[in-house]
């Protein structure tokens, strides 16, 4: 029954860290966090069998690191209706929480794939998609772009071509009408039994509509979208893990307005071309500005690298380094 809610193995855990923790708590049973509220957690040991449980006392203390508490998608060990341990995460998506203070916010854990849902209206923004990709890939999760509202776009192929030009060919891009049955077929390769997928994107991008289509029922509330900026209200108010008919698990999330880096990200996946060129520079500490023998500048000179792409690489790298510096200062 655990496999139906995303247990990653056909039997007992194959991961050494999981084995060790399960051995310590041998009288406890595993469960998955399917909802997280201020008042506590809802977990499941099987599909459609939610259980309200008490969290660890330490998690309720003021000042306890938020990223060390359980989040939707996490696996925990239960003693009765009480969480006694958090199993190690295989993957996680996190960002810097909104506000002036440095605080990490975990979005979801133990994912295989994250669908970046983007409407082909005023919501379409390749640079924002790029930020999502950095956050997702840095957490060990596979990003997939899902373009919705194809009926509002005159040339869907052109939008897909923009992303193909901007991103690595390895990034999957799928365009669908979220109201129809086609997403079930188009997205099936990522929705196989035992896999876990999260929906990320702005409010009004079509996440709730897509969720209802994949579920095969109208379970999630769908809101109206403002015409002036293609933004919607938060119809999804909390994260929830939902078993799909395909055998996969889907985590629906509220829309995110800010995508701040924590300082732990890297750009190896999303800027693999620049990272590879950098290894060919004459100097190991080349800043790709005016240094002789710079392979990155040479690529711009011969037209194989878009200078705007390098500019954005510098911008994102600067944000990541800045976030890392602020995190370090906060520790001392």
Swiss-Prot record:
Q: Which InterPro entries match?
A: G_CP_dom, P-loop_NTPase, Ribosome_biogen_GTPase_RsgA, RsgA_GTPase_dom
Give the record's keywords alphabetically: Cytoplasm, GTP-binding, Hydrolase, Metal-binding, Nucleotide-binding, Ribosome biogenesis, RNA-binding, rRNA-binding, Zinc
Span of domain CP-type G:
103-259
**GO terms under cellular component:** cytoplasm
Cofactors (names): Zn(2+)
Protein's job: One of several proteins that assist in the late maturation steps of the functional core of the 30S ribosomal subunit. Helps release RbfA from mature subunits. May play a role in the assembly of ribosomal proteins into the subunit. Circularly permuted GTPase that catalyzes slow GTP hydrolysis, GTPase activity is stimulated by the 30S ribosomal subunit.
Under HAMAP family, the record lists: GTPase_RsgA (MF_01820)
- Give the protein name, as stated in the record: Small ribosomal subunit biogenesis GTPase RsgA
Species of origin reads Xylella fastidiosa (strain M12)
């Amino acid at each position: 029954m655990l496999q139906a809610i995303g247990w990653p193995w056909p039997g007992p855990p194959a991961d050494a860290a999981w084995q060790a923790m399960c051995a310590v708590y041998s009288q406890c049973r595993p469960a998955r966090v399917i909802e997280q509220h201020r008042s506590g957690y809802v977990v499941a040991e099987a599909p459609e069998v939610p259980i309200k449980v008490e969290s660890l006392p330490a998690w309720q203390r003021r000042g306890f690191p938020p990223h060390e508490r359980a989040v939707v998608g996490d696996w925990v060990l239960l003693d009765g209706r009480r969480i006694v341990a958090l199993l190690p995460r295989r993957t996680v998506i996190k960002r810097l929480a909104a506000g002036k203070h440095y605080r990490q916010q975990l979005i979801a854990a133990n994912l295989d794939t994250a669908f970046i849902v983007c409407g082909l209206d005023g919501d379409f923004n390749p640079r924002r998609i790029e930020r999502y990709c950095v956050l997702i890939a840095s957490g060990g999760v596979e990003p997939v772009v899902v373009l919705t509202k194809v009926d509002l776009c005159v040339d869907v192929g052109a939008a897909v071509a923009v992303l193909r030009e901007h991103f690595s060919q390895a990034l999957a891009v799928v365009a669908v009408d979220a109201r129809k049955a086609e997403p079930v077929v188009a997205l099936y390769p990522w929705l196989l039994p035992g896999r876990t997928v999260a929906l990320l994107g702005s409010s009004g991008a079509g996440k709730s509509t897509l969720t209802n289509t994949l579920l095969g029922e109208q379970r999630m509330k769908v809101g109206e979208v403002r015409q002036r900026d293609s933004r919607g209200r938060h119809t999804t108010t909390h994260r929830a893990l939902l078993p799909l008919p395909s055998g996969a698990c889907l985590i629906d999330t509220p829309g995110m307005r800010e995508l701040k880096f924590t300082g732990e990200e890297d750009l190896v996946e999303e800027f693999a071309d620049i990272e590879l060129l950098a290894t060919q520079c004459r100097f190991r500490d080349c800043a790709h500005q005016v240094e002789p023998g710079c392979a990155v500048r040479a690529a711009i000179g011969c037209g194989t690298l878009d200078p705007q792409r390098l500019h954005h690489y510098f911008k994102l790298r600067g944000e990541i380094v800045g976030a890392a510096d602020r995190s370090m200062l906060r520790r001392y």
